[in-house]
Amino acid sequence: MSYFPWLTILVVLPIFAGSLIFFLPHKGNKIVRWYTISICLLEFLLMTYAFCYHFQLEDPLIQLKEDYKWIDVFDFHWRLGIDGLSLGSILLTGFITTLATLAAWPITRNSRLFYFLMLAMYSGQIGLFSSRDLLLFFIMWELELIPVYLLLSMWGGKRRLYSATKFILYTAGGSIFFLIGVLGMGLYGSNEPGLDLERLINQSYPATLEILLYFGFLIAYAVKLPIIPLHTWLPDTHGEAHYSTCMLLAGILLKMGAYGLIRINMELLPHAHYLFSPWLVIIGAIQIIYAALTSLGQRNFKKRIAYSSVSHMGFIIIGIGSITNIGLNGAILQILSHGFIGATLFFLAGTASDRMRLVYLEELGGISIPMPKIFTMFSSFSMASLALPGMSGFVAELVVFFGLITSPKFLLMPKALITFVMAIGMILTPIYLLSMLRQMFYGYKLFNVPNANFVDSGPRELFILICIFLPVIGIGIYPDFVLSLSVDRVEALLSNYYPK
């Protein structure tokens, strides 16, 4: 047990401080903006301090544990704790949310509510990544939906209500299966229902029940990740949402599904995961190709980037399905790498479309001349997304490749076939990204329009872009910085699959 409640403070601080926004003096938006950014920054500094001085990397066990009785009637506890799996995701959440808050600077309509919802999301995400009770995990999973729905439906494009409704229907539908799985786990095999993850790790289930529970959880994660065919909410949502909301969706929300798949399905249901893993790898390989081909056919450049996200999630699914030390570490690396790259591409797409008031590629062209800074950063992050050596995307995809090749679970022919499919997906990625860059930035179409007055990136936007570019390069050059966080925990987790 930790003597100081670091994690409780990290979970409660954003939503509590966010609720005070409504009591700030009504003297324009500047006070609200600076207050929100200060809270995000304070939270990020607190978590960095707590993890630097109170977390031992070489210890694969759960650390900074907290356990408080919450509801007496059915023994429900507020249980928090972190390990190497959740550490990277929590730091990513703090980093991206702070920069997304800074990205939301131009928001003036209902700005108090907007910033409160962003802080409420922050609490939900930190709570999910640090919860050690399955019911608390589910509550945090659901807490996320309300702010996202409101952010989508109130700030965005013309079809924002349609995309917000589609998002809530998909995620609420997945949550029903999640809740059934939670209840099934809690009520099985004991007179007193308990959902402590420490106890559930040692719980064994009949084969049929374990497969049903696994499948129920998988549907919920398949919506969030997303896994095809439950992905269609994502392009609509990213096409309509404000770019600061897109940063949170692409950077953190999609990663919650991957985290749940590792934390719940792999850790608590190892036998079912061992059975399902070949199917996960096949689905991941199909997803890489399918989403890349679909992305190539998109006229709206925001939707093209959204489908590229779906394609990159395929590598995470393959890494999780490979059941190897290398593959799972590669999946965790890809979670963080895509968190940085995906969030930035949506930020760049949003800022560019705000300036041009255009999103269709055939209407664009020649904007590299009036907007050289946006062009440079867009090109740099597109290169990171297509896995250019020296950037985080390359290392993550390469490690997942090696994880699949070294997996003892698969025979040589299936390995060769899936590797071939992944390679085709990696070839398609530069095709759709570079063709998007060519259509947007090269040529003379918009440059020759009379009275066209395009403004390049300002200091605030450049600061956000450089802040994210540094870790992308850093992870690409020295991936061990991230892998060292999770390597011991991954080894402990996989000991359930391959006992020594």
From Swiss-Prot:
**Could you tell me the Gene Ontology terms of the biological process aspect for this record?**
ATP synthesis coupled electron transport; electron transport coupled proton transport
Q: Does the keyword Transmembrane apply?
A: yes
| This enzyme's EC code(s) | 7.1.1.-
Classify the protein's membrane topology as the record does.
Answer: Multi-pass membrane protein
Please state what class of enzyme this protein is. Answer: translocase
Q: Where in the cell is it found?
A: Plastid, Chloroplast thylakoid membrane
Positions of transmembrane segments: 4-24, 37-57, 87-107, 113-130, 134-154, 167-187, 211-231, 242-262, 274-294, 313-333, 334-354, 386-406, 417-437, 462-482
Q: Which GO terms describe its cellular component?
A: chloroplast thylakoid membrane
NCBIfam families (UniProt xref) = NDH_I_M
**Similarity comment:** Belongs to the complex I subunit 4 family.
> What protein is this chain from?
NAD(P)H-quinone oxidoreductase chain 4, chloroplastic
**What is the gene called?**
ndhD
